[in-house]
Amino acid sequence: MCKTRIIVSAVLPLLVLGTLPLVALTESLPPEQPHGLVVVLENKPQESQLDLRVLKNPYIRGVALQIRWRDIEPVQGQPDWSKLDQLLAAAASSNKWVQFLIFPGFFSPSWAMEGAQTVTFPIQYGPGKGTLERLPLPWDRVYLGHWFDFLKQLSLRYGKSPALRVVAAAGPTSVSAEFTLPHKPEEIQKWKAVGYTPNKYIAAWQKVFEVYAADFPNQYVSLSLGSGINIDERSERNVRAGKPTKEAIIGEATRILGRRFALQDSNLDGNPDPRRGPHGVPLVIGYNGRIVTGFQLRTSCVRNSGNMGAEGDPQLALKKAINRGTQPNSNGYRSNYLEIYETDVLANEMQPMLSYGASLFK
């Protein structure tokens, strides 16, 4: 761990974004940990309000909102908070807790990329998959500076809300809050051309964790599991480079955020075959009981039961995913929360599985 800190500090001058105190907030915690089944809401930009019917579900304890930065702040300094206001008010009145999953990266507003170095890649998964978009370099100080300004506005408006329990760390990201970057062979060549190194990527994340620790002292800060690019410090392709980069980023989050750190895997399914199943599941389960841990299903079981582990049987797919994400580790600890997409939570036929899942968190 010490070796990683030394390497990271050596590249911090690349991120001249002002100085922040290094906050290891282990002495004070938010009143309650995130806990239970959580519904994932995907913002629909074409609609003026969120559809919050799902908050009435008795098996759901929390709400995770996925929303793009450019849909909140299309004009610099003029954020539209209406949907976030709506969600927090409804969550408070229905006794639910909230996680913000705000996506910069590909989904940053155009003004935030002016003057920033970008590379064009196809979106690698999710809505818009395959669409060519500009991605700001994860360590670009212009881009990160704008993102940090937005986070400050976010914290000033919602940082004291009792309903807001988790904020997802993002910034050196691409398509979601997971720390994943495009990594096909031809994309690796682009990263080499723009000077990607593990140290630059780790240093960007270290700065991000410091900002979140300072701006959100009343919340847990989640990190959705990803990995580094398989490029080493010499900017050469190295199939072993990604794993230590991932470990270093998790280590920095643990060091800076302390007990307010929540490690999350957002690729959970019910596939038993380790060649198809989610590789991050055992890693996160290993942290159960030491820090807050959680899982998010990779997709809806109703819409894609085959990929979720039971072709043609959404109920079984959801049950298998729940069992996988809530299995105790060797010390007997389970994860704190499990996130399920709105389509599955609204479906009548899935209610027995939701009841079953909720019972595991009591």
PLM feature segments, named:
Residues S9-P21:
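Bacterial N-terminal signal peptides
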Residues A24-T26:
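Boundary at the C-terminal end of the N-terminal hydrophobic targeting segment
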Residues P31-Y196, Y212, P217-A241, K246, ...:
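Aromatic-lined carbohydrate-binding surfaces of glycoside hydrolases
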Residues I6-V8, C301:
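Sequence-pattern detector for short linear motifs
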